[in-house]
Amino acid sequence: MLGRIRLFLFKIKKSINMNFELTEEQLAVKEAARDFAQNVLKPGVIDRDNNQRFPVEEIKQLAELGFMGMMVDPKYGGSGMDTMSYVLAMEEISKVDASASVCMSVNNSLVCWGIEKYGSEEQKQKFLVPLATGEKIGAFCLSEPEAGSDATSQSTTAIDMGDYYLLNGTKNWITNGSSASTYLVIAQTNVELGHKGINALIIERGMEGFIVGAKEDKMGIRGSDTHTLLFNDVKVPKANRIGEDGFGFTFAMKVLSGGRIGIAAQALGIAAGGFELALAYSKQRKAFGKEIYKHQAIA
């Protein structure tokens, strides 16, 4: 019986043709990301974090590498890479600078992916291209003061005024809050319809009534600009709505599902970077006559 089971498992493995080795392209992306993290991000990362300084120039260089629109079709200015390449790049960047990687993650996983997957051709040409090339940075606006990231409990409203929506409300804890130029905002259009009355709108910096509010003084990832956003009678053209009327909730759920891949890769990178630093320190620090890594509690 055991032999039959082994033979069965062998046949399954052979038929699936499992291959967990990285391709040459993926290895090249990983190496490029590692080199960039070590040589460009690492020298100033402590200063940026201490002073809450957004890595403006560093993000521009990330864009030059094609890392701000990694999975976007080249016809829209992206790099056309696969998800694994994106994950590998996120890990390497996050090992050194989580502030740079979270900006990269939001732009790739949430904003670029959301517009490419569900936006109109006009929206892709107008908004996706500059986001994928890194000319502009995007932000995803869902969380609210009294609702957190519960997409079904939106207090921000987008009232249908015929040719446009009138947007009012507040969004909190928005990554890339002050550095972004393009914002995906989730808002309630029809309260009676519940989650089926929610829309996703593309907001541009400079729209009248749109204000970037207070910056959060965070414990970590301080180089990332996390802000409150205020919308006071902002007129949003109907052309800026993503998908059909009432598609906003589904859009948010789909986009967040993809976004979890980037954030998981970031968490893995942060953990790996922390381990590498701790290991190096344990070989330098001495206590009781020997390096601390030789003590049982650490070894």
Predicted regions and their residues:
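A structural signal for short hydrophobic beta-strand segments in well-ordered beta-sheet cores
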Residues: 156-159
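N-terminal glycine-rich flavin-associated loop
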Residues: 102-122, 148-151
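A short core secondary-structure module
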Residues: 164, 168-212
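Amphipathic, small/basic residue-rich leader segments at the start of a protein or domain
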Residues: 5, 9-105, 122-126, 130-133, ...
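Short Gly/Pro-enriched turn/cap motifs at secondary-structure boundaries
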Residues: 131, 146-149, 173-176, 190-192, ...
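A short, Trp-centered hydrophobic/proline-enriched beta-strand micro-motif
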Residues: 134-142, 186
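Glycine-rich beta->alpha junctions and the first turn(s) of the following alpha-helix
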Residues: 19-29, 91, 95, 210-299
